[in-house]
Amino acid sequence: MRNFDLSPLMRQWIGFDKLANALQNAGESQSFPPYNIEKSDDNHYRITLALAGFRQEDLEILLEGTRLSVKGTPEQPKEEKKWLHQGLMNQPFSLSFTLAENMEVSGATFVNGLLHIDLIRNEPEPIAAQRIAISERPALNS
């Protein structure tokens, strides 16, 4: 697997390094699970994954630095089924997203087969200039 970190070049994007994720997954045609990235306002985002057939116990979310990883390991049926048509995927998966420096995960919920991961951008306060008084006597005695 190839890893490219282009996040320093793309800080103006919405908090996600889409190009780096695309390059990292080049050659791996990962289309499961489908997901959306929603922007509520300049500081609030939501990642939603469609996970029909998964249980909350099957899912794991990890945040390591700026890398958000979501893994799913569904419980396998005890007996093999004979499918006439199988359109719903129920397979293990691993997805990762690169977050911008000031992004934080504010919470996650799993409702009706949809995993929602809420993100907040916390912009640091700018450091105010500090005025230094100038005295007439020397600061160091020599």
Curated annotation (Swiss-Prot):
Assembly notes: Homodimer. Forms homomultimers of about 100-150 subunits at optimal growth temperatures. Conformation changes to oligomers at high temperatures or high ionic concentrations. The decrease in size of the multimers is accompanied by an increase in chaperone activity.
Domain characteristics, as noted in the entry: The N- and C-terminal flexible termini are involved in oligomerization and in the binding of non-native substrate proteins, and are essential for chaperone activity.
The protein's name: Small heat shock protein IbpB
PANTHER family named among the record's database cross-references: PTHR47062, SMALL HEAT SHOCK PROTEIN IBPB
Cytoplasm keyword on record: yes
Upper lineage: Bacteria, Pseudomonadati, Pseudomonadota, Gammaproteobacteria, Enterobacterales
Pfam families reported in the protein's UniProt record: HSP20
This protein's UniProt keywords: Chaperone, Cytoplasm, Stress response
Function per UniProt: Associates with aggregated proteins, together with IbpA, to stabilize and protect them from irreversible denaturation and extensive proteolysis during heat shock and oxidative stress. Aggregated proteins bound to the IbpAB complex are more efficiently refolded and reactivated by the ATP-dependent chaperone systems ClpB and DnaK/DnaJ/GrpE. Its activity is ATP-independent.
Record has Chaperone as a keyword: yes
Family to which this protein belongs: Belongs to the small heat shock protein (HSP20) family.
Domain sHSP: 26-137
Subcellular localization(s) per the UniProt record: Cytoplasm
CDD domains: ACD_IbpA-B_like
Source organism, top-level taxon: Bacteria
A GO cellular component annotation in the UniProt record: cytoplasm
Biological processes, Gene Ontology terms: protein stabilization
